[in-house]
């Protein structure tokens, strides 16, 4: 008997210890910052029972600050028994601003049709709006919504849950959903349920969810207009680019995609595919306004001859040797820095506004047709022939003409002043191997500066020659230093139907590079300002 009692006591002791350990483990488990209500509320007369009961649970959820979601929306007014108080409205001289839960009478019954936090109130808690058949849109940004269930919301048209710590979302049987935005969350490949049911989707944005590695868009890729999977882990098996016939905008930056074939796209307007290891990028034949950013992808060639509507390209940091824009008459912005360019053909691009082609292997560049070119940077090349002629009603007329005898190079560049953050514009003289820079002189041989980098003021007229001599040669004797010829005012623009023919200056004597500037337009610091012009 005593042995039996000892066994019972031992078993009870073990059970107590196990229970204590279990309670301790439970206490250490992470808990949500919010608490869902367990109270029961009767559905008000005239309101759909499913809609009210699903939504009142969310409205009664207490957030991490100890405030119910309903109170966060409409402080001091919210009552769970009156759904009309779940919406906050304020009148302004320009109109009414409102956010919260929207109801609408449909077939004699009030139905939940929309939820919007208006960017201004932080809502927290899990969402279960399943079978709310007339729910049309949900907009929640900057909230804390770990999970969301919209299954069988047959009228759901748009979901926007961004930067909300979302880990799982169910959109099963949401047959009419057109827009699915769930970017900046914690979704993984298994966290999106039912996407294959959403055959009407035209806008898909799941960017900034690095754990998404598999994504099946085959149910709606043919009618997609906007696709953004930036900063996700998806790869080549997830997107068939040849099926994206209707797409307007694509962003696949920072993914694992290596092959992009857009040749079947008929109306693409924006393609962003930078910072990923591309094997190739095949562009469509289309005349739509198009901007492309494919910087830092490793592509070795880029054929834009079929993109007649191309107006902006950034292909910097790629080993591309040739770019030809002769079939791109609407080209306005070219950024091709730190490539291996040997040829940059801009003939006929008379709408150019900015060209950056720094640190390449260019020996010549023709921008003479660009009468609106206000920003031109070409340092770090071996340019021997530059003609920059601007003639428009905003900037007036100015010319930069450069001819080289083969012993030095001249470039136009800028840097940002670290103190004022303004632009420092300069002409730069770089001697070839075996030569040295002597000075800048005017056309009469008067010395202007001995600094190879000469800072200039935009929209003033300059006539300068960069003098180079072989190493070891005797110094060149010049007149006393003089200031360059600067006009008081920029020349008035010459408005003609056709661009005026450039006047080629006399070729300087051997040992000099001539730089003739009749006024230079203002050049802004920083990157190119994107200015899209319709045509």
Residue ranges and their predicted role:
Residues 8-13, 26-137, 175, 199, ...:
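N-terminal capping/linker segments that flank leucine-rich repeat
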Residues 22-38, 505-513, 530:
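Sec-dependent signal peptide cleavage junction
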Residues 116-123, 139-145, 155, 160-165, ...:
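Concave beta-strand-loop units of leucine-rich repeat
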Residues 126-127, 148, 169, 190-195, ...:
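Canonical leucine-rich repeat
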Residues 423-451:
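Surface-exposed interfaces of beta-sheet-rich extracellular modules
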Residues 452-462:
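Solvent-exposed segments in extracellular or luminal domains encompassing
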Residues 469-509:
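C-terminal low-complexity, Ser/Thr- and acidic/Pro-rich disordered "stalk" regions positioned immediately N-terminal
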Residues 513-533:
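A cross-kingdom C-terminal cell-surface attachment/processing module
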């Amino acid at each position: 008997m005593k042995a039996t009692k000892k066994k019972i006591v031992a078993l009870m002791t073990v059970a107590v210890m196990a229970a204590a350990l279990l309670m301790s483990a439970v206490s250490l488990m992470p808990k949500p910052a919010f608490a869902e209500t367990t109270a029961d509320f009767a559905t008000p007369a005239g309101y759909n029972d499913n809609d009210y009961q699903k939504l009142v649970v969310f409205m009664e959820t207490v957030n991490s600050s100890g405030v119910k979601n309903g109170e966060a929306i409409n402080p001091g007014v919210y009552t769970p028994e009156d759904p009309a108080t779940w919406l906050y409205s304020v009148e302004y001289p320009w109109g009414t601003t409102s956010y919260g839960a929207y109801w609408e009478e449909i077939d004699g019954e009030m139905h939940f049709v929309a939820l919007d936090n208006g960017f201004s109130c932080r809502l927290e808690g899990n969402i279960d709006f399943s079978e709310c058949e007339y729910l049309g849109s949900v907009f929640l940004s900057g909230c804390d919504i770990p999970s969301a269930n919209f299954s069988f919301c047959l009228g759901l048209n748009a979901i926007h849950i961004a930067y909300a710590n979302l880990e799982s979302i169910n959109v099963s049987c949401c047959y009419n959903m057109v827009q699915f935005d769930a970017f900046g969350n914690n979704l993984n490949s298994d966290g999106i349920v039912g996407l294959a049911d959403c055959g009407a989707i035209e806008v898909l944005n799941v960017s900034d969810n690095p754990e998404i590695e598999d994504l099946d868009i085959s149910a709606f890729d043919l009618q997609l207009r906007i696709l953004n999977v930036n900063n996700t882990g998806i790869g080549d098996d997830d997107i068939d680019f040849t099926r994206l016939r209707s797409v307007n905008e694509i962003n696949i930056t920072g993914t694992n995609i290596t092959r992009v074939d857009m040749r079947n796209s008929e109306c693409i307007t924006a393609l962003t595919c930078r910072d990923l290891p591309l094997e190739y990028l095949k562009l469509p034949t289309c005349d739509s306004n198009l901007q492309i950013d494919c910087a830092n992808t490793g592509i070795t060639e880029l054929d834009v001859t079929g993109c007649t509507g191309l107006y902006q390209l950034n292909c910097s940091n790629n080993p591309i040797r040739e770019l030809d824009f002769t079939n791109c008459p609407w080209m306005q912005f070219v950024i091709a820095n730190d490539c291996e360019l040997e040829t940059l053909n801009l003939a006929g691009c008379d709408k150019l506004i900015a060209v950056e082609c720094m640190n390449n292997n260019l020996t010549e560049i023709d921008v003479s047709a660009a009468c609106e070119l206000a920003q031109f940077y070409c340092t770090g090349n071996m340019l021997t022939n530059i003609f920059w002629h601007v003639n428009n009603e905003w900037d007036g007329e100015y010319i930069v003409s450069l001819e080289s005898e083969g012993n030095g190079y001249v470039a136009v560049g800028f840097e940002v002043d670290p103190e004022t953050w303004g632009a420092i514009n300069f002409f730069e003289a770089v001697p070839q191997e075996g030569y040295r820079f002597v000075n800048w002189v005017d056309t009469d041989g008067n010395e202007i500066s001995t600094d190879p980098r000469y800072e200039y003021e935009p929209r003033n007229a300059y006539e300068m020659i960069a003098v180079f001599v072989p190493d070891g040669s005797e110094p060149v004797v010049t007149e006393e230093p003089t200031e360059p010829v600067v006009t008081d005012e920029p020349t008035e623009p010459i408005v003609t139907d056709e661009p005026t023919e450039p006047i080629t200056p006399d070729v300087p004597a051997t040992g000099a590079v001539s730089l003739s500037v009749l006024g230079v337009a203002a050049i802004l610091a920083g990157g190119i300002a994107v200015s899209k012009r319709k045509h």
